[in-house]
């Protein structure tokens, strides 16, 4: 990998091929992160829904005992 110094402030620049490859990797990482984030939101919503049904069943059960 060639890293060249540009100007006198010693900033580095990558060759065009590596820069394009890094952009693809970053794009893939962003897509993967969004996928994981979406899956976690779905799981959280599912668990919240399960808790609501669990409370509803408990209420129905205790109401049945009182009647």
Swiss-Prot record:
Official protein name in the record: Uncharacterized protein YjbS
Superkingdom of origin organism: Bacteria
Lineage of source species: Bacteria, Pseudomonadati, Pseudomonadota, Gammaproteobacteria, Enterobacterales
């Amino acid at each position: 990998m060639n890293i060249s110094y540009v100007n006198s402030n010693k900033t580095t620049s990558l060759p065009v091929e590596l820069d394009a490859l890094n952009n693809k990797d970053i794009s893939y990482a962003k897509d993967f992160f969004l996928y994981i984030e979406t899956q976690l939101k779905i799981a959280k919503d599912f668990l919240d829904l399960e808790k609501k049904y669990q409370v509803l069943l408990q209420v129905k059960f205790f109401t049945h005992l009182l009647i």
